């Protein structure tokens, strides 16, 4: 029995070690460079976050297939609709100049109030003039409110509030209507 337990422990430890080694193994290369996420061709990752309001994810990171030539605005609208989340666009979804004005937010629809993480509040309160000028934050509260439709939209809670995206943690110099989706990227709103 002791031998069986030792053998089982050894196999368990070995399998854990081998699985962690594969996580650090060299990523697969593809035609555009490095495929660090090991996603299938024609797929990418998209998520919508509301961490700054203390609400976590609106849409968890999701691997999705995209259509060749599809823009981030088109993909976002399609994925949000598939997840029963509203997507309010400024302009047509296929317009290069379009951008996302609002996204349906279940936390907001459920009546949640902002619960900004303490480390952010500490910074806001340490620099009140900057916070008011750049974020629309006044000590003791926000100068904006939500309009009650369950959609987190631009200018709500802050005069400068709005949806921005990053591609692999890099802000791109074009709007979502002009950003073409490509393989192996993570798009975060």
What does each model-identified segment do?
Residues 1-3:
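N-terminal secretory signal peptides that target proteins for export/translocation
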Residues 5-15:
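Sec-dependent N-terminal signal peptides
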Residues 15, 19, 24-189:
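Ubiquitin-like/PB1-type beta-grasp interaction modules and other compact soluble beta-rich domains
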């Amino acid at each position: 029995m002791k031998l069986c337990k030792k053998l089982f422990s050894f196999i368990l430890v070995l399998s854990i070690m081998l699985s962690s080694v594969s996580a650090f193994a060299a990523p697969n290369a593809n035609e555009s460079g490095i495929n660090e996420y090991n996603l299938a061709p024609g797929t990418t990752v998209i998520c919508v976050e509301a961490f700054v309001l203390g609400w976590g994810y609106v849409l968890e990171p999701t691997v999705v297939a995209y259509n060749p030539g599809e823009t981030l605005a088109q993909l976002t609208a399609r994925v949000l609709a598939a997840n029963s989340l509203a997507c309010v666009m400024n302009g047509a979804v296929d317009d290069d100049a379009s951008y996302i004005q609002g996204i349906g937010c279940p936390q907001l629809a459920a009546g949640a109030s902002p619960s900004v993480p303490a480390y952010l509040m500490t910074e806001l309160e340490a620099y009140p003039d900057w916070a008011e000028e750049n974020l629309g934050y006044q000590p003791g509260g926000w100068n904006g409110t939500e309009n009650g439709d369950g959609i987190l939209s631009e200018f709500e809670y802050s005069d400068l509030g709005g949806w921005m995206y990053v591609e692999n943690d890099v802000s791109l110099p074009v709007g979502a209507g002009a950003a073409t989706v490509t393989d192996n990227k993570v798009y975060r709103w």
